[in-house]
């Protein structure tokens, strides 16, 4: 069954909601990177956040990248997403697997750490991308995304992200929701939504009970004039290519590329997002070096 993402509004546009079921794409991502359970939960939460935030982009050419690194054993997680809800990502240490936290859950916050920052980089095709940077709040990802929206974009936001890792290390359930109060929204409405989110409980527990993201929307907003705006099919998809790798090699500059050429070896470049291998003979490196000198 394909993953799904739904965009909606409630209360005459006072509330914006994006909810996603991301089990398949998270499964694909953690298999590519051969993640241990805690690493799988960390990468999965970031992929889910990336998909939802990517779907907020207005142009097909816009790109958003999220980077979180709090100095923990995960050694940082990076995801890149697009307006079509495609996403890719990687974790610095896919083998990280900590003891359960005090709540008996996978210790994502401990793996990511709290001594660092969350970067949100939006590339709109201009000369310079827009970069937002906030200190890590808890390292649990959802709290940090909510903190970013509230502090950096002055948009009160509730974020719920969840990844349930099964005994065979596959992803049993994964999903997320981002709820934002639009300018001028009733403050009492925000309190009501907060209470309902508490009643909803864990997103993965909700989904694991046989319910869907449609049920989640109805549970939270059924009596608030809920309007579905759009439904999308998010996917884990890497857009790497030999041509892009060639451009990346050229971009490192003549000095560094010449050092690679002088080694006289065949170079193998591995895409950090999907694991695809690209080999370049010494002769091919030489041709790229000529292009740098032009």
Curated annotation (Swiss-Prot):
Keyword Signal: no
GO MF annotation list: protein folding chaperone; unfolded protein binding
GO terms classed as biological process: protein refolding
Domain of life: Bacteria
Disulfide bonds: 238-240, 271-274
Alphabetical list of Pfam families matching this protein: HSP33 (PF01430)
GO cellular component: cytoplasm
Localization: Cytoplasm
UniProt PTM: Under oxidizing conditions two disulfide bonds are formed involving the reactive cysteines. Under reducing conditions zinc is bound to the reactive cysteines and the protein is inactive.
Key words of the record: Chaperone, Cytoplasm, Disulfide bond, Redox-active center, Zinc
The keyword Disulfide bond is assigned to this record: yes
Known function: Redox regulated molecular chaperone. Protects both thermally unfolding and oxidatively damaged proteins from irreversible aggregation. Plays an important role in the bacterial defense system toward oxidative stress.
Family from the record: Belongs to the HSP33 family.
Protein name: 33 kDa chaperonin
